[in-house]
Each structure stands twice: as structure tokens, then as C-alpha cells.
Swiss-Prot record:
Keyword Transcription: no
Residues bound to Mg(2+): D32, D34
PANTHER family: MULTIFUNCTIONAL CCA PROTEIN
GO molecular function, one term: tRNA binding
Keyword tags: ATP-binding, Magnesium, Metal-binding, Nucleotide-binding, Nucleotidyltransferase, RNA repair, RNA-binding, Transferase, tRNA processing
Additional facts recorded: A single active site specifically recognizes both ATP and CTP and is responsible for their addition.
Protein name: CCA-adding enzyme
Amino acids binding CTP: G19, R22, R102, R148, R151
Enzyme class, spelled out: transferase
Keyword Protease part of the UniProt annotation: no
Chain's gene name: cca
Family to which this protein belongs: Belongs to the tRNA nucleotidyltransferase/poly(A) polymerase family. Bacterial CCA-adding enzyme type 2 subfamily.
HAMAP family given in the database record: CCA_bact_type2
Catalytic activity annotation: a tRNA precursor + 2 CTP + ATP = a tRNA with a 3' CCA end + 3 diphosphate; a tRNA with a 3' CCA end + 2 CTP + ATP = a tRNA with a 3' CCACCA end + 3 diphosphate
Amino acid sequence: MSRADDPGVAGLQVYIVGGAVRDGLLGLPAGDRDWVVVGATPEDMARRGFIPVGGDFPVFLHPRTKEEYALARTERKSGRGYKGFTFYTGADVTLEQDLQRRDLTVNAIARTPQGELVDPLDGVADVRARVLRHVGEAFAEDPVRILRLGRFAARFGDFSIAPETMQLCRRMVEAGEADALVPERVWKEVSRGLMAQAPSRMLDVLARAGALARVMPELHDDAAVRAEIDRAAAAGLPLAGRYALLCRHTPERDALGRRLRAPVECMDQARLLPLAVDALAASATPAAQLDLIERCDALRKPERFDALLQAAAIVAPVDLSAWRARVQAVRAIDAGAIARQCAGDPARIKPALRQARLQALGGA
């Protein structure tokens, strides 16, 4: 059933907005669709069976499709940071007013259920020109938009950033707006940027705006870091590996992880990757191989070790098959049998187990 003949929205003015419209114009696969409703009230939506899920402003789930429908709204700055907003969602808010509050022109295009575009801010022209441009001066009211700009630059590698948009970001940082960002919002955007096709562009945007030193002051950012995270993206590494490579040259990586409140898996890989890279350079002997396996807890966490090796392979040649065979060879050693052989002399167990593992590696 198309949205044009959906009884759930019959009589309502509904439009697809944001990323789904933008990506459709770019010929990219459509993700989740977001809808805006013009001329309705929360009571209207409730009568139709829509399920309210919004916190700060009215957002509803369609009773059948579970897609999100938000009432058209305007925003007014009422405090510092990304939470300092007052919203108005009256039935008199127009579609154009709703689009005007959005961040970038490419995200401020609407489409009717019949496929007609509504583009009061010339977003289609910017999509065609491959330009990321802020909608208006209200962009400066939300510092998260600096991070989002970096993420979009990482995702759309062939898009440039309008000079006036970069200038506005710099003014925002100079005004202290970036200092109001909370870790959860920074991590949300940074992690999504790392998972984009060109993560280095996110760092470039944040650095040029002056925001990188504010939101990630511990990070050591240079050409090597940027090249490595881009190679990680090309190789399809998961987030933990990309984050570990981001932090590889950062001495204060633990402090950075705590600041961002990064997931434990990401912080673990960031901590272990330098050890792995250093050890791999000198891992010709079974003793060096075993030290790396044990220090990385590869026997208990083989999947994490495998992911770690894949991240290390971005930096230096790694024979993944050989390392997997080594881990399996060490895991095959029966520690219980060795303990029984050393019954009565517990001090012999640890060296005997190590010797057995070294012998196994010698034949792996």
C-alpha cells in the first residue's frame, strides 16, 4: 500500500523528509523514512491510532508500518548547547517553516507521497553540485551540527563544504558552543563518522573548524592516522578496529576513551593494538608469538584477537591464517593433563604449560 492511499494518514498533509529524500536523489539505497505531518495536533494523531514516542516534541509511530511521523515544528534558541531549545508544534506551522529549521540544505528537501519534491531552500541544486551548505544562521544554535557536518563529509566523500558554512562553524567554536557538547552526542556522531567511507574527512572538518581540539583534546591527529582509518574503512573493519587505529598514535588513549565514553570493546582494542603491532614486528620466535597471544587474552577471547589482527593488518603485513592456526594450536594444549602430571609439585605447572605451548607453536 502506498502512502497516498494509506487510510492511517488519509486527510493529513504528510511528507517524506531528510535523508531518505537526499539519498534517493543520489541514487543510494533508501534507509528508514522519516515523515513530517503538517496541520495536525497530537490529539489528531492519537485518534488515528498513532503511538506517541517523542520526548521533547511530538513524534509518533504509524500503527501499522511503525515508521516515525513528527509534527511540523519550529525551534527557538533558549539556552546554551544542543539542549537549549524551545519547540513549537502548532497546527499552523508550515512545511517551509519546518524545513527552515534543519541543518543542511541537502537535508531540507521534502517529497509528497506522490513523488513531488518540495525544495524551498534549493537543496536539490546542492545535491547535484555535491555541496554541503547550512540552511541559515540558526545552524549556529546547535553545536551538534558541527559534528554532523563532519559525519556527512565522511559519508559523502565527493561533497565539498561551502566556505560560508565552514566559517560559521569556526565562529561557533570560538563562541564556546562546542564546549557544551556532552560525551554521548560526541560519540554518537564520531562513531558514525568512523563507519563512513572516508573517516579522515570527518577529522579534517573538525580540525578546520577548531572543534577537534575541543571535543577530543587528547587525540593525536596526523596524516598517518587519517590514512590508516581510511584504509580500515576500505577494508570494511568494524567500529572497534577503526577506533583503535584512530587512537594508535595517541599516548592518552585511555583518557580519550573515558572522555568519549567509548564502548569497552573499542577501548580494549585501542589499548591492545599498539602491543600487537609492536609484537608482530618481532614475532618470528615461538616465545614472541606466545607472549602476544597471552597478553591479548587470545585463548579466552579468540574473536577479539582475530579482530585485533585485522586492525593490525592495516598497519603492517599480517598472515591471518597462520595466526589463527597458532591460537588453535595453543588452545589445544590440555592444561588439566599437565597439572596432573605435575601433581605434588605445583610450581612446575606454569613452566611446563608454557613449554608445551611453545612446542605447539614450533609446529604450528
